[in-house]
Every structure is written in structure tokens, then in C-alpha cells.
Curated annotation (Swiss-Prot):
One of its GO terms (biological process) is bacterial-type flagellum organization. Required for the secretion of flagellin and expression of motility. It comes from Salmonella muenchen. Belongs to the FliB family. Keywords: Bacterial flagellum biogenesis. This is Flagellar biosynthetic protein FliU.
């Protein structure tokens, strides 16, 4: 098994969403794809609001299990229908961070894999990320870890993104 190097700046390690305190919100203008499990979870939710929004706003595509549906953004502003009046996510508030779609649970995180190297980063489209980079002198300090399994690295990375309660704690 080959050794894998994971490199990420400090601001990636310490990032957490500022939720409704954010100067903007990331729940607009996206193509939010849903896997089959998530579509079924939303459509069968015990919460009437989650279920009704799903029935009215999920377009079933059934391309493959990871692209089973998409959320249409009916608002004139292009806002997600699950965004509430406090600019918080109804799915996360009601069902928890683990119920978020891959699109919602991973933003603003990104990972880039090349051979035996993984580089984790965050998108500057997120105001909280931009603020940390501009205001924290140590934000760009690179950290490096070694691992022997690409799968375990990616699993930890995406588990971490959900544990941070991104998109509205």
C-alpha cells in the first residue's frame, strides 16, 4: 500500500460556518444534486415541512444513484426552498447535518487528488473563508499528514465537513 500525503492550510483545519451571522448565505444559485438515499429521506420525512418542500421542489432525474434528483430553486433570488426566514437550513435544523446533500455538506470544502497526494482547500466564495484568510496571519500555514489509505482520508475529510455543521449550525 502506498503512502498518501495530505496537505492543507490551517484555515481548512479550523473552519466552521458562521451560520445566520454570515454577511451572505451559500444557499442560492446552486445546482443541488441529490443521491437516491437523500431523495427518499426527504420525501419520506416525518417532518411535514421537509416532506412538502421535497414533494414540491425535487426534480427526479434518476440518472444514477448519486444523481437521482435535483432541488429546483423557485425563488426569484435563486434561494433554496429549505432556507428559512433566519437564513438557516431547515434540513439541518430538523434532521441534522448528516441529512444534508453532498453539495450542501461539502461546500465550501474542496479536495484535489493527484497520484499519492491530496490537497484540501476551501472556496473563497464563502465570506467566512475569505475573512479568515484576510484576518488570520497563520491561515495559510500548511500542514502535512501521512496516511496509507486514500479512502480513509476522503472519508475523514467529508465526515469532518458534516461534523462542523457547515451550512448553518
Amino acid at each position: 500500500m502506498k503512502e498518501i500525503t495530505v496537505t492543507e492550510p490551517a484555515f481548512v483545519t479550523h473552519f466552521s460556518c458562521s451560520g445566520s451571522a454570515c454577511s451572505d448565505h451559500c444557499c442560492k444559485g446552486w445546482k443541488i444534486t441529490l443521491d437516491k438515499t437523500t431523495v427518499k429521506k426527504y420525501l419520506a420525512s416525518k417532518d411535514a415541512t421537509i416532506r412538502t418542500i421535497a414533494q414540491d421542489n425535487i426534480i427526479l432525474l434518476k440518472k444514477n444513484n448519486s444523481h437521482w434528483g435535483e432541488i429546483k430553486l423557485p425563488s426569484a433570488l435563486g434561494n433554496c426552498p429549505y432556507l428559512d426566514e433566519d437564513r438557516l437550513c431547515r434540513v439541518q435544523k430538523t434532521l441534522g447535518a448528516k441529512a444534508l446533500s453532498h453539495t450542501c455538506s461539502s461546500f465550501p470544502r474542496a479536495h484535489h487528488t493527484y497520484k499519492n497526494e491530496v490537497r484540501n482547500s476551501l472556496s473563497l466564495a464563502c465570506p467566512e473563508v475569505t475573512s479568515r484568510i484576510l484576518n488570520d496571519p497563520d491561515a495559510m500555514a500548511l500542514g502535512e499528514k501521512k496516511s496509507f489509505s486514500r479512502h480513509s482520508i476522503l472519508r475523514r475529510y467529508f465526515q469532518r465537513s458534516k461534523s462542523y455543521s457547515i451550512c448553518f449550525a
